[in-house]
């Protein structure tokens, strides 16, 4: 139930399969700390100890495999529990989808101590997820009709090349009343965006911003004003993140 609530509140997360739950119960190498409030589990952290040196057995690191929390107070409590393990491990490896996670730390610099020109300190290693792929754009929009968008009325056409079918396609989406839907094929588009199929998936999932894609030349639009409005409609406050193996 705790993980289900976490998945429902965080963009991109999915429910655990029964196989994952059974595997977790049998994995004796992973330790878990739970946060309970009124008898209800409101968060937990799953971690394992790993050797951090080939020549010094006293050097260890703590690798966090799961960090589930219902709010910031629970998160801070779980991080405090990890801090109590500092006599057993000198460093901690955390995986998170929160871009601003380093603001929780008094010193945001990671253990690399890398300095990046000019005046930048390395805080983390970033990675691109490969879980979310767009195979059928129209079906994706239909199945996610429940999503809430900012207020606005606009019809957008996305032109891209379907790499699997080896043909050009056009996905028309109508935004109205805080929802989106597949627009009729002959509807007039307020703005037409041309991009790659993979970038379209990122745009529709909220993994990237349309304005950045236009600045970089990764996408083009035929109406600058409407493109800015479309960027506002597509923007979501949290980028998708998934901590499940697949």
PLM feature spans:
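Intrinsically disordered, low-complexity, positively biased terminal segments
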Residues: 1-246
């Amino acid at each position: 139930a705790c993980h289900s609530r976490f998945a429902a509140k965080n963009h991109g997360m999915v429910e655990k399969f029964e196989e994952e739950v059974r595997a977790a119960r049998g994995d004796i190498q992973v330790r878990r700390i739970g946060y309970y409030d009124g008898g209800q589990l409101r968060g937990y952290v799953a971690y394992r100890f790993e050797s951090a040196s080939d020549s010094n057995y006293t050097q260890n690191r703590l690798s966090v495999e799961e960090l589930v929390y219902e709010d910031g107070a629970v998160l801070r409590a779980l991080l405090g529990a990890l801090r109590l393990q500092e006599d057993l491990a000198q460093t901690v490896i955390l995986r998170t989808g929160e871009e601003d996670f380093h603001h929780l730390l008094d010193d945001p610099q990671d253990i690399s101590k890398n300095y990046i020109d000019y005046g930048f300190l390395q805080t983390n290693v970033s990675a691109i997820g490969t879980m979310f792929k767009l195979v059928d754009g129209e079906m994706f929009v239909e199945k996610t009709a429940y999503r809430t968008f900012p207020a606005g009325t606009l019809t957008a056409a996305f032109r891209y090349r379907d790499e699997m079918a080896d043909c050009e396609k056009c996905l028309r989406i109508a935004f109205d009343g805080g929802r989106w839907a597949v627009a009729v094929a002959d509807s007039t588009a307020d703005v037409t965006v041309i991009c790659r199929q993979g970038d379209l998936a990122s745009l529709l999932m909220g993994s990237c911003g349309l304005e950045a894609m236009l600045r970089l030349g990764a996408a083009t639009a035929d109406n600058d004003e409407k493109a800015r409005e479309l960027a506002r409609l597509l923007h979501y406050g949290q980028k998708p993140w998934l901590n499940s193996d697949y």
